[in-house]
Amino acid sequence: MTKLPKLSSNSSLLGLSSEDLEEFARQEGEKSFRGRQIHEWIYQRGAKSLDSISVLPKKWRDSLVRKGIQIGRLDEINRVVAEDETLKLLMGTFDGEIVETVGIPTDKRLTVCVSSQIGCPMGCKFCATGKGGLNRSLDVNEIVDQVISVRETMNRRPTHVVFMGMGEPLLNIQNVLDSIECLTSDIGIGQRKITVSTVGIPNTLSDLAKLAQDRLGRVQFTLAVSLHAPNQTLRELIIPSASSYPINSLLKDCKKYIDLTGRRVSFEYILLGGLNDKDIHAEQLANLMRGFQSHVNLIAYNPIAEENFKRPSQSRVNAFRELLENRGVAVSVRASRGRDKDAACGQLRRQTIDKIKIN
């Protein structure tokens, strides 16, 4: 007997492929075309409940509901739109948790910044998400839903997805890879338009390369490493978890990843005014990047209430970038979006949780 497709831990159909849903229908005693109908209604029509899929026999729909099967869509709690049209969504899960995602539009693209966990265990000093610790990892349906929800809310097809929201993607590696497969196969976002970010977890980059090759056939998404400092002492100050992963070991593992995948690595560097944005830091960073198949993304810090870090001036950002460019480093500056609506990672969710506690 063919094995029944594996549902997520919350018995959701969202995240399953057309082939999986066809097999699911057959195992349920229905014709395989019923699975294709479910696929169309979930991924193209945005069905949020089984009862809304009117083409399915009501008797079967009722049976699935009794078994606890669900589509697995999240419930919108709040939405905020910034002056630059950046969208921030807060969505509720089946167990009462809050997921945060961001839609970032430009003229030619719509990037969705998705979360991979509820909270985060890494404790990066500049990040609002890490202040509350980790609650749990997200299931595939909860990751994919973020992209669908932004598509529906903005009435526009997402072109890019970045795993740069709440959580450490490599601590939820299987669900992240499964959701990438769903995003490419079922929603139509090419792997090259997807970025997976990590602060660096020891002994995971080679595993990521091998697992991704097994799951996706070929690694085409971009790996973005959150570096944020050019030396170990400063990195541990900004990212406490870095104490267990020396920067030289991290870079060595990045080179192995490049060898295994043939893909360059992107390094994220958040500029904290007066702390890691001096000329000497740019020079140290340029030395680290020497001989690397890489790209550096500079990000000016978005302040959060709990920390006293400062946002650098635009002139300091420009000087830092120019110093890297003059030393042959491929570098760009990421534009800050949604600053008037607390669009830094985790801010809106944390404020919402605080309000709930107060009330």
Swiss-Prot record:
Q: Which residues form the Radical SAM core domain?
A: 106-340
Q: Which InterPro entries match?
A: Aldolase_TIM (IPR013785), Methyltransferase_A (IPR040072), RlmN_N (IPR048641), RNA_MTrfase_RlmN (IPR027492), rRNA_lsu_MTrfase_RlmN/Cfr (IPR004383), rSAM (IPR007197)
Matching entries from Pfam families are given as: Radical_SAM, RlmN_N
Cofactor binding note: Binds 1 [4Fe-4S] cluster. The cluster is coordinated with 3 cysteines and an exchangeable S-adenosyl-L-methionine.
Q: Where does [4Fe-4S] cluster bind?
A: 120, 124, 127
* Location(s), subcellular: Cytoplasm
Q: Which SUPFAM superfamilies match?
A: Radical SAM enzymes
**In which broad location class does this protein mainly occur, judging by the first location in its UniProt entry?**
cytoplasm
Q: Which Gene3D superfamilies does the annotation name?
A: 1.10.150.530, Aldolase class I
- Active-site residues? 100 (proton acceptor), 345 (s-methylcysteine intermediate)
Which keywords, in A-to-Z order, does the entry hold? Answer: 4Fe-4S, Cytoplasm, Disulfide bond, Iron, Iron-sulfur, Metal-binding, Methyltransferase, rRNA processing, S-adenosyl-L-methionine, Transferase, tRNA processing
Q: What is its EC number?
A: 2.1.1.192
A Gene Ontology biological process term = tRNA methylation
Report the enzyme's class at the first EC level. Answer: transferase
What are the disulfide bonds? 113-345
Write one Gene Ontology MF term: metal ion binding
Q: Which family does it belong to?
A: Belongs to the radical SAM superfamily. RlmN family.
What role does it play?
Specifically methylates position 2 of adenine 2503 in 23S rRNA and position 2 of adenine 37 in tRNAs.
Instruction: From the Swiss-Prot or TrEMBL record, give the protein name.
Output: Probable dual-specificity RNA methyltransferase RlmN
Species classification: Bacteria, Bacillati, Cyanobacteriota, Cyanophyceae, Synechococcales
The primary gene name is rlmN
